[in-house]
Design a protein with these regions (language model features):
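Conserved beta-ketoacyl condensing-enzyme motif
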Residues: 17-19, 23-158, 190-200
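Active-site pocket-shaping loop/turn-to-helix segments
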Residues: 9, 59-80, 129-138, 156-171, ...
């Protein structure tokens, strides 16, 4: 029996630059002075550089007040860029889009905001946490932000399954459409950056420490000389949509999903 055909509209954060880097072997891994200061064994990282000017293209001044969650920052940028690349409008109206939802995953998000909040609470400054502390630190914060910005009225969920989170979100979104419960789904995943996320991995000694002097050579997962992974962060997003719907509105179509499956992953 043939699978129904669904289509994907894809955009990865900085798609043009990312594609150029892959084609030309350009590494985004750099020396991380903060990891050196904190005496990490691995002192290189892949951290997106987001300028304040760029942030203002995706968040209002009010939203950026007391904002301190890189995972949500990366996810919102990737999600909104994917939405626009799919030819979908970003509108401010009172009517939710009941046919569209999001399943956007994260491993850990808002750790810096957690740290900030803990210090304020311990200093008896709970009232200074701000009204967005919860949204920035809850796992489903990224899907809540995207759902709110895009007015999504269908399922708004965050999944979390370590390294398979992004792939799992695609399959979950695909199944939602396949079951006839949604016309389109914004899917993807995001991850915070910083030492409080990466410290545990450094302690496990699974991060490379042999390339601190040559960061661009640190990420080499398929090499016989690989000595561990490089702590990194960022986000990726896709718009999944019914074939008929995508064709009817002349959407840019990148690929087709025929099916998929989720098992127990790498657990022993």
């Amino acid at each position: 029996m043939a699978f129904p055909k669904w289509k994907i509209m894809q955009l990865i954060l900085g798609l043009d630059a990312f594609t150029n880097a892959i084609k030309n072997g350009i590494s985004g891994i750099k020396f991380d002075a903060e990891l050196e200061r904190l005496k990490f064994s691995c002192q290189i990282s892949g951290t997106p550089e987001i300028l304040e000017e760029l942030k203002s293209n995706y968040f209002s001044d009010l939203e950026l007040r007391n904002f301190n969650s890189t995972g949500i920052l990366y996810g919102v940028i990737a999600g909104l860029d994917a939405w626009k690349d799919a030819g979908l409008p970003i509108e401010n109206n009172e009517n939710p889009d009941w046919e569209t939802g999001t399943i956007f995953g994260t491993g850990t998000s808002g750790i810096e905001k957690f740290r900030e909040s803990i210090y304020k609470i311990d200093a008896f400054e709970t009232r200074r946490l701000g009204s967005t502390a919860v949204a920035q630190t809850m796992n489903s914060g990224i899907s809540a932000y995207l759902g709110g910005k895009l007015g999504l009225g269908n399922q708004v969920t965050t999944n979390s399954s370590a390294c398979t989170t992004g792939t799992e979100s695609i399959l979950m979104g695909f199944e939602r459409i396949q079951q006839g419960k949604a016309k389109r789904m914004l899917v993807g995943s995001t991850s915070d950056s910083g030492p409080y996320i990466w410290g545990g991995f450094d302690a496990m000694k699974v991060c490379t420490f042999k390339h601190n002097e040559q960061p661009e050579k640190g990420s080499r997962p398929m090499s016989a000389t690989a000595s561990g992974f490089v702590p990194s962060s960022g986000a990726g997003a896709l718009v999944l949509e019914e074939l008929e719907s995508a064709l009817a509105r002349g959407a840019r179509i990148y690929a087709e999903i025929l099916g998929g499956n989720v098992n127990s992953g790498g657990q022993r």
